[in-house]
A protein has these predicted regions:
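Oxyanion-hole/transition-state-stabilizing segment in secreted/luminal serine hydrolases
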Residues: 1-30
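Surface-exposed acidic, glycine-flexible loop patches that form ligand/cofactor-binding
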Residues: 1-2, 41-42, 46, 133-134
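Structural recognition of the beta-strand scaffold that forms the well-ordered cores
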Residues: 4-10, 48-54, 87-90, 115
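Structured catalytic/translocation cores of nucleotide/phosphate-coupled proteins
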Residues: 5-8, 32-40, 51, 117-124, ...
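Catalytic His-Asp segment of secreted/periplasmic serine-dependent ester chemistry enzymes
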Residues: 16-18, 55-134
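Alpha-helix N-cap and loop-to-helix initiation/capping positions
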Residues: 23-31, 35, 63-71
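Alpha-helical scaffolding segments of alpha/beta enzyme cores, especially the outer helices
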Residues: 31-41, 45, 74-78
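N-terminal/domain-start segments enriched in small and hydrophobic, helix-friendly residues
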Residues: 37-53, 63-67
Length: 134
């Protein structure tokens, strides 16, 4: 109660855990987009301004795969062009390695290559335009 804004970051575990799922359980880019759109619609129906974040890279993590990276890219492209939300914070652009965009830049990468380290979390925090949340 009382929330006016929400920042949604969704999808990376749905991509990664597919290695353990049966073919019928695997999420496609369209599945993830539909799930995110549903969450956005639910929040907006409650009068909440919604902001999305792009999914950060995860190459080097045990559940990285090329098909999973393709899904991440497709969903991120949709997020970046989404007109149903109040804004987008591009965490992918903030922390990716320019030489290898499927990987988090070493300075920001946690030990598992999926999560950020303290400097990485600081970097994504700095990439949020706080004026949009006022």
């Amino acid at each position: 109660a009382g929330a006016t804004h929400a920042i949604l970051q969704m999808g990376i575990n749905d991509i990664g855990f597919q290695l353990a799922w049966t073919p019928n359980e695997k999420a496609t880019a369209a599945d993830l987009i539909n799930s995110i759109a549903s969450a956005v619609a639910a929040a907006k129906a409650m009068g909440i301004q919604v902001y999305l974040t792009t999914m950060t890279p995860f190459k080097g993590h045990v559940y990285f795969s090329d098909p999973g990276e393709q899904i991440r890219q497709e969903v991120n492209a949709w997020i970046r062009t989404n007109t149903e939300v109040s804004g987008v914070f591009d965490f992918d652009a903030a922390v990716r390695d320019p030489a290898e965009p499927a990987r988090i830049l070493a300075a920001y990468r946690g030990a598992d290559s999926l999560h950020l380290n303290d400097l990485g979390y600081l970097r994504v925090t700095e990439s949020i335009d706080l004026d949009k949340l006022r």
